[in-house]
From Swiss-Prot:
Pfam families xref list: KH_2, Ribosomal_S3_C
Taxon lineage: Eukaryota, Cryptophyceae, Pyrenomonadales, Geminigeraceae, Guillardia
Family stated for the protein in its record: Belongs to the universal ribosomal protein uS3 family.
Subcellular location: Plastid, Chloroplast
UniProt entry tagged with the keyword GTP-binding: no
Disulphide connectivity of cysteines: none
CDD domains: KH-II_30S_S3
GO cellular component, one term: cytosolic small ribosomal subunit
SMART domains given in the database record: KH
Protein name as annotated: Small ribosomal subunit protein uS3c
InterPro entries, alphabetized: KH_dom (IPR004087), KH_dom-like_a/b (IPR015946), KH_dom_type_2 (IPR004044), KH_sf_prok-type (IPR009019), Ribosomal_S3_C_sf (IPR036419), Ribosomal_uS3_bac-typ (IPR005704), Ribosomal_uS3_C (IPR001351), Ribosomal_uS3_CS (IPR018280)
């Protein structure tokens, strides 16, 4: 039976980069890793409506820098920047540590081509009881209008309330998962419906690019 590796981890430092960038000793590593998890969980939970694609965290000696990639930056920034200040205050309370925090809000130039936001859109449609084929077709059409070179969407579970769970997928264009220089965006989401949880996987092919580092 074929096993599939995570496309983002498979291409680390080739077409994708680490989303946490810092150095730690063996003793402090677990604590910093837990802090990253708490920060991401908090932002994704509190700013669910902001259309967040990814969160990058970097640290130096006395500063924590959080970069949030979003399709709706206004929701995060808030009026006169009050939203940013609230995030800083909440993160300090969460970490229970006196540290300088910098929040960068980066607007996505092409949100319809982002795998995370595509998966989120499909999950929202399924939770509104839209038929899964219609939801996936709408998402794929939006991605095609955003000029992606290929997209694949898989939905698993009790589709349309069926008694037996199954998986169905749709692909348009090329999605070369075995090509390391292929710029593949990947995301997984869950839709909580009255029939149970549906799993959603999205692969988006944005063309090939020259690796930043040599591939051995």
């Amino acid at each position: 039976m074929g096993q599939k590796v995570n496309p983002l981890g498979f291409r680390l430092r080739i077409t994708s980069q680490h989303r946490s960038s810092w150095f730690a000793t063996k003793e402090s590593y677990p604590q910093l890793l837990e802090q990253d998890f708490k920060i991401r969980s908090y932002i994704n939970r509190e700013l669910e409506a902001a259309g967040i694609s990814k969160i990058e965290i970097s640290r130096n000696a006395n500063q924590l820098e959080v970069s949030v990639y979003t399709s709706r930056p206004g929701i995060i920034v808030g009026r006169s920047g009050l939203g940013i200040e609230k995030i800083k205050t909440d993160i300090l309370r969460l970490l229970k540590q006196d540290i300088s925090i910098r929040i960068n809000v980066i607007e996505l130039t092409n949100p319809d081509a982002d795998a995370n936001l595509i998966g989120e859109f499909i999950a929202q449609q399924l939770e509104k009881r839209v038929a899964f084929r219609r939801a996936t077709r709408q998402a794929i059409q939006k991605a095609q209008r955003a000029n992606v070179q290929g997209i694949k969407v898989q939905v698993s579970g009790r589709l349309n309330g069926a008694e037996i769970a199954r998986s169905e997928w749709v692909r348009e264009g090329r999605v070369p998962l075995q090509t390391l220089r292929a710029n593949i965006d990947y995301a997984t989401k869950e839709a909580h419906t009255t029939y149970g949880i549906l799993g959603i996987k999205v692969w988006v092919f944005n063309g090939e690019q020259t690796p930043t580092y040599a591939v051995i």
